[in-house]
């Protein structure tokens, strides 16, 4: 196979000690990359690159299985998941495994089985990675033409893209099948405080599903993050599955149009940069989704959202003071605004005090108390249920802040510095990883464009100006 870049052209760029370092027969002279460039050394050996990716998948699946078993071994049934530092069991609980009414974990055996299945899968992937790295053919196209590829073969690259899209579509439909036919999923909006149920009537109306994409990302609109019912969520996965599978078939059967051939850089590093950009975007969206959405990420498992904890505090003190005889409808706070209840500028009745900024919160424990124009005073005076009080009191002291004392008006327990919400972990990790993936996209995109334009990679250290300068002393 013709090599896109001269392999020896750039090896002088590295420091001299790299010239003598060789891993698996791949030195800087033979590949154009130093040992620390990792898989870049495997750009032109598709079989070994496959081995690296399969082994990487094995490591990921091994961590998932081992960490799941670790969380199962440390699980305490008397405490909620979010108070135990669990970051994997909440996902499994959301899928409806081992969960009862109100989000109570009633059976951890499914989690044990899932953890073991992941460990077994990781062993298979690990063996495959070792085989393709050490024993299998170096170049797939010589032994298995169907699996071989040339980075510059635009038709083959879009075919591979199509296969990936079909696999993503199948993944979306797996959730749909689980929700509709195999045990259902956990719905935090189910009456009485949440329960596992089948989603029998997913939303298929394109005006509803794609209407989320046309919403403003600000305030109460919330773009796609504003999904607040399981019918829309599962219906969205049906649409995404159809689009991904349809797009995959399209890319397999067609060749890139002329404008696409001219617009994109067609090299291994360019495809890496495109992938990093996509992952970065998904990371940033997931970050905001986890932080604000309590439908896809139920508060019973992930802990309350920040706005939810704040509104829960206002609600808890309203309940307390109302029992002590306070008229919560007319009481004034220190600023002259309503202490417990007030009207928003549009006239909607909302909680007063510092939590007024979170007026757009929607939560299962609060919605039964709303009327046609915000919070219903009659319901607040006569229809607050014990389960709503208990849940609000719990959420009030478990805000995803990691703070020792009150921040933003949210009360915390005196030992709350020991509590870090899984919602905080997920949000922060997705933001940080999304940021670094974006930086990596810029890095690799710049390198790919420079290589395509024929620019020099790096500096020729034999002719650096500093070498001809006088010593400092």
From Swiss-Prot:
Membrane topology recorded in Swiss-Prot or TrEMBL: Multi-pass membrane protein
Binding positions for [CaMn4O5] cluster per the UniProt entry: 367
Localization per Swiss-Prot or TrEMBL: Plastid, Chloroplast thylakoid membrane
Short name of any one Pfam family annotated for the protein: PSII
Superkingdom: Eukaryota
TM region(s), chain numbering: 69-93, 134-155, 178-200, 255-275, 291-312, 447-471
Keyword Metal-binding applies: yes
Propeptide: 1-14
Cofactor note: Binds multiple chlorophylls and provides some of the ligands for the Ca-4Mn-5O cluster of the oxygen-evolving complex. It may also provide a ligand for a Cl- that is required for oxygen evolution. PSII binds additional chlorophylls, carotenoids and specific lipids.
GO biological process, one term: photosynthetic electron transport in photosystem II
UniProt keyword terms in alphabetical order: Chlorophyll, Chloroplast, Chromophore, Manganese, Membrane, Metal-binding, Photosynthesis, Photosystem II, Plastid, Thylakoid, Transmembrane, Transmembrane helix
A Gene Ontology term for the protein's cellular component: chloroplast thylakoid membrane
A GO term, aspect molecular function: metal ion binding
Record's keyword annotation contains Plastid: yes
Job description of the protein: One of the components of the core complex of photosystem II (PSII). It binds chlorophyll and helps catalyze the primary light-induced photochemical processes of PSII. PSII is a light-driven water:plastoquinone oxidoreductase, using light energy to abstract electrons from H(2)O, generating O(2) and a proton gradient subsequently used for ATP formation.
Quaternary structure (record): PSII is composed of 1 copy each of membrane proteins PsbA, PsbB, PsbC, PsbD, PsbE, PsbF, PsbH, PsbI, PsbJ, PsbK, PsbL, PsbM, PsbT, PsbY, PsbZ, Psb30/Ycf12, at least 3 peripheral proteins of the oxygen-evolving complex and a large number of cofactors. It forms dimeric complexes.
Family: Belongs to the PsbB/PsbC family. PsbC subfamily.
Record-linked HAMAP family: PSII_PsbC_CP43
Note: Although originally identified as Cyanidium caldarium, these sequences derive from Galdieria sulphuraria.
Annotated protein name in UniProt: Photosystem II CP43 reaction center protein
Source lineage: Eukaryota, Rhodophyta, Bangiophyceae, Galdieriales, Galdieriaceae
Gene (name only): psbC
């Amino acid at each position: 196979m013709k090599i896109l870049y001269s392999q020896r052209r750039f090896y002088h760029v590295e420091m001299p000690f790299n010239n003598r370092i060789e891993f698996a027969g791949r030195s800087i002279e033979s590949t154009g990359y130093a040992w620390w460039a990792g898989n870049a050394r495997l750009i032109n050996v598709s079989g070994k690159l496959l081995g690296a990716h399969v082994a990487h998948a094995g490591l990921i699946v091994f961590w998932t299985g081992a960490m799941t078993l670790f969380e199962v071994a440390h699980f305490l049934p008397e405490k909620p998941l979010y108070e135990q530092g669990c970051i994997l069991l909440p996902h499994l609980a959301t899928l409806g495994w081992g969960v009862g009414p109100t989000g109570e974990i009633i059976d951890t055996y499914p989690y044990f089985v899932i953890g073991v299945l992941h460990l077994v899968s990781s062993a298979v992937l690990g063996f495959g990675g070792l085989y393709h790295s050490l024993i299998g053919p170096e170049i797939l196209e010589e032994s298995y033409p169907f699996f071989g590829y040339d980075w510059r073969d635009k038709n083959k690259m879009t075919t591979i893209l199509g296969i990936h899209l079909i696999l993503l579509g199948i993944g979306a439909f797996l959730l749909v099948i689980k929700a509709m036919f195999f045990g259902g999923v956990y719905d935090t909006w189910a009456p009485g405080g949440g329960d596992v149920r089948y989603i029998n009537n997913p939303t298929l109306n394109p005006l509803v599903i794609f209407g989320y994409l046309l919403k403003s990302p600000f305030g109460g609109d919330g773009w796609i993050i504003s999904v607040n019912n399981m019918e829309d969520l599962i219906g969205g996965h049906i649409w995404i599955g159809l689009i991904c599978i349809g797009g995959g078939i399209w890319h397999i059967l067609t060749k890139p149009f002329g404008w696409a051939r001219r617009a994109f850089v067609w090299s291994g590093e360019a495809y890496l940069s495109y992938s990093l950009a996509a992952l970065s975007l998904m990371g940033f969206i997931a970050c905001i989704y986890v932080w604000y959405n309590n439908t896809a990420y139920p508060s019973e498992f992930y802990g309350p959202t920040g706005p939810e904890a704040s509104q829960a505090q206002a609600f808890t003190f309203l309940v307390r003071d109302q029992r002590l005889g306070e008229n919560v409808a007319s009481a004034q706070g220190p600023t002259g605004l309503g202490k417990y209840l007030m009207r928003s500028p549009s006239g909607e009745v909302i909680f007063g005090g510092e939590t007024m900024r979170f007026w757009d919160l929607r939560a299962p424990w609060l919605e039964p108390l709303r009327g046609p124009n915000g919070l219903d005073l009659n319901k607040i005076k006569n229809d607050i249920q014990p389960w709503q009080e208990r849940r609000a009191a719990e959420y009030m002291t478990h805000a995803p802040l990691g703070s020792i004392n009150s921040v933003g008006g949210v009360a915390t327990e005196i030992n709350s510095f020991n509590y870090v919400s899984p919602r905080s972990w997920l949000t922060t990790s997705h933001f940080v990883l999304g940021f670094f993936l974006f930086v990596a996209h810029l890095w690799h995109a710049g390198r790919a464009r420079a290589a395509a334009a024929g620019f020099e990679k790096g500096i020729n250290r034999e002719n650096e100006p500093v070498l001809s300068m006088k010593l400092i002393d």
